[in-house]
UniProtKB/Swiss-Prot annotation:
Transmembrane segments: none
Summary of the function given for this chain in its UniProt record: Cleaves collagen, gelatin, casein, alpha-1-antitrypsin, and bovine insulin. May play a role in the pathogenesis of legionnaires disease.
Enzyme Commission number, as recorded: 3.4.24.-
Protein name (database record): Zinc metalloproteinase
Swiss-Prot/TrEMBL cofactor(s): Zn(2+)
GO terms (BP aspect): proteolysis
Gene Ontology MF annotations: metal ion binding; metalloendopeptidase activity
Textual note on the cofactor: Binds 1 zinc ion.
Keyword Metal-binding: yes
CDD domains, per the entry: M4_TLP
Main localization of the protein described in the UniProt heading: secreted
Protein family per UniProt: Belongs to the peptidase M4 family.
Propeptide: 25-207
Species of origin: Legionella pneumophila
Length: 543
């Protein structure tokens, strides 16, 4: 396939010259220049002037115009030298004439922008090989992505003006690269025609890909249906205008549709979102494969919508309350939360595997497990792993599991200002025989969990030993002058700074006291709460 590039008639006519750089280009700030001065040095192609009529080496080519409410017409132009576009050379004419032209433009017309003089002396004319080598420059650029799916390759011969105002013959090259696991990118570079080294390079898909808003529905038959954009905030999604596709992804969260399979390339769920008069101004689009706001499954309105919202809330909760990322990469930079939904067949669970969160769609006992609480729970396993590293067995395992339950309640509290003190009530089906997975106010209500440390025994499942710290959290948050946020403050601080991988219940209590002291919270209230769940703090040293 031949590359796409544009040459003006003038460029073709003089492309057989010889280049002879001499000196730097001279920038002309147009706010300080008169219209007559500009027209003496540059040929303007205002509306009504045919492109083929351009005979000057230096020209300002018409791009577009519009007239504002003050009846001033603003005409945008790009500088060309020898028929090739000049990097950074743009002029805007501001005319009170409704149809500005060279004949009607006045000498005192206002302009702004920057154009460059002296290019003739610095560049001379392009070498015969300048245009011919454009295809070669593009191919070398494409070779960097030889193992990727590449399309829409483009090359434009041009003049590049560097930061020192030196002018260079150059090529602007770009390709569209399709990835299996993330949004497409458009690598773009301006390359030196002599050395093939880039002057600048960037991902140009950012000019087409915009943060957009998603409308849609969530919930399930038990809790009812709610609407994002009405009952809850609009969803933060991403849109690629070049292909009119939306992606269930933003800088914080990516939602992957597993399609009821067990393996995935982690490509974000995507759907067609065409521009309409209604969406053009609001940048708001209905989510779902049919763009109706749904991707129904097992009684739930849209697991993808709920997953995106849950991830967004959880990440922002940690950031807003504690100034930290929910999860980070090995170099300490923020980690995008990957929420995988529609996992497997009849899978009634959710998990964190060290890299991502995965949610089943439930079966006979549960609706899809993508509630805010379950999402907060799974993400917070990652938070614990990256901070205290509480091992997932014994008493430390119970603390690990409990911290995630606490985070589930905190996410609800952060989102709507209240919480249920139950884990998973929103996903349990009405005929399952259970109204929740666990209860923080009285953990033993589930028939398996323990309420106090004295009831712990070796080998107890961590989901049941979590009852001790779940109960502790409930008691502390309900002390006079306390609330859920304050209680979670203590637990987060302890997890980050005091707990260790093999902490026992008692050692965890000491960490809580140290954390509370750091925060300036009442230690006696903590001691009282610890006593109620038979955690011994007598050996704790808090200076």
């Amino acid at each position: 396939m031949h590359p796409n590039y544009y040459l003006s008639p003038l460029a073709v006519a003089i492309a057989l010259g010889i280049a002879s750089p001499v000196k730097a280009a001279d920038p002309i700030p147009l706010q300080k220049s008169s219209f007559s001065e500009v027209t003496q040095k540059f040929q303007l192609t205002l509306p009504g002037v045919m492109k083929g009529a351009v005979v000057s080496t230096n020209s300002l080519q018409f791009i577009r115009q519009h007239t504002d409410g003050n009846k001033v017409t603003h005409v945008r132009m790009q500088q060309q030298y020898a028929g090739f576009p000049v990097f950074g050379g743009y002029a805007i004419l501001h005319s009170k004439n409704a149809t500005p032209s060279l004949a009607t433009a006045k000498s005192d017309e206002k302009m702004n922008g920057v154009i460059y003089d002296g290019l003739q002396a610095e560049l001379g004319q392009p070498k015969p090989s300048f245009v011919k080598n454009a295809s070669m420059a593009l191919q070398q650029f494409k070779d960097k992505y030889a193992n990727k799916q590449v399309s829409e390759d483009q090359v434009t011969p041009m003049i590049y003006i560097d930061e020192k105002h030196q002018a260079h013959w150059a090529y602007k090259v770009s390709v569209l690269v399709i990835h299996d696991d993330r949004i497409p990118e458009r690598p773009t570079a301006i390359i030196d025609a002599e050395t093939n080294k880039p002057f600048v390079q960037w991902d140009d898909v950012k000019t087409e890909k915009v943060q957009a808003k998603g409308m849609g529905f969530g919930g399930n038959r038990k809790i009812g249906e709610y609407q994002f954009g009405k009952d809850l905030p609009l969803l933060e999604i991403t849109r690629d205008s070049s292909v009119e596709m939306c992606f269930m992804e933003n800088t914080d969260v990516k939602v992957v549709d597993m399609g009821h399979k067990y393996y995935s390339n982690n490509k974000p769920m995507q759907f067609t979102c065409k521009e309409t008069p209604d969406t053009q101004s609001t940048k708001t689009y209905y989510t779902g494969y049919s763009a109706d706001g749904y991707d129904r499954d097992n009684g739930a309105a849209s697991p993808t919508n709920d997953a995106l919202y849950a991830g967004y809330v959880i990440k922002h909760m940690y950031h807003d309350w504690y100034g930290v990322e929910a999860l980070t990469k090995s170099d300490g930079s923020p980690m995008q939360l990957v929420m995988r939904v529609h996992y497997g067949q009849g899978y009634e669970n959710a998990y964190w595997d060290g890299k991502q969160m995965t949610f089943g769609d439930g079966d006979t006992m549960m609706y899809p497990l993508v509630s805010l609480g379950v999402g907060g729970h799974e993400v917070s396993h990652g938070f614990t792993e990256q901070h205290s590293g509480l091992e997932y067995f014994g008493q430390s395992g119970g603390m690990n599991e409990s911290f995630s339950d606490m985070a589930a309640q905190a996410a609800e509290y952060y989102s709507v200002g209240k919480n249920s003190w139950q884990i998973g009530p929103e996903i349990m089906k009405e005929d399952s025989g259970y109204d929740a997975l666990r209860y923080m106010d009285k953990p033993s209500r589930d028939g398996m969990s323990i309420d106090v440390a004295d009831d712990y025994y070796g080998g107890l499942d961590v989901h049941y030993s979590s009852g001790v710290y779940n109960h502790l959290f409930y008691i502390l948050a309900n002390q006079p002058n306390w609330n859920l946020r304050m209680a979670f403050d203590v637990m987060v601080k302890a997890n980050m700074d005091y707990w260790t991988p093999y902490s026992t219940f008692d050692e965890g209590g000491c960490g809580m006291l140290s954390a509370a002291k750091d925060l300036g919270y009442n230690l006696d209230d903590i001691k009282k709460s610890l006593s109620e769940v038979t955690i011994n703090y007598q050996s704790c040293y808090v200076d």
